[in-house]
Regions:
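Positively charged, small/polar-rich N-terminal and surface patches that mediate targeting and assembly
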Residues: 1-89
Length: 89
């Protein structure tokens, strides 16, 4: 079953995470975004993966996010969604 990973990461981590994922042969779409109470700049990464690839992709995101400095400020938020249908045209 296909999964959609939506990873919202700090904008300064976005390029490093994108590089790591593409080097691991994941197809990734990066979207500039902002959010949260302070409207901080973020990067939203979209990945379509097989179910058995989710853990490895999440691990790459974790490994290539900068260390958390402030307990109230997370470096990444990752959503994993079921994909009912997937097609490329």
């Amino acid at each position: 079953m296909m999964k959609l990973i939506v990873a919202v990461v700090h904008h300064t981590d976005g390029e490093e995470i994108l590089r790591a994922l593409t080097e691991a042969h994941y197809s990734v779409t990066r979207i500039a975004s902002s959010g949260g109470f302070l409207r901080r700049r973020t990067a939203t990464l979209l990945l379509g993966v097989q179910a058995d690839q989710v853990a490895a992709a999440r691990q790459l995101i974790r490994e290539h996010s900068a260390p958390q400095v402030d307990a109230g400020f997370k470096r990444a938020t990752v959503f994993v969604l079921n994909v009912e249908r997937y097609e490329q045209v």
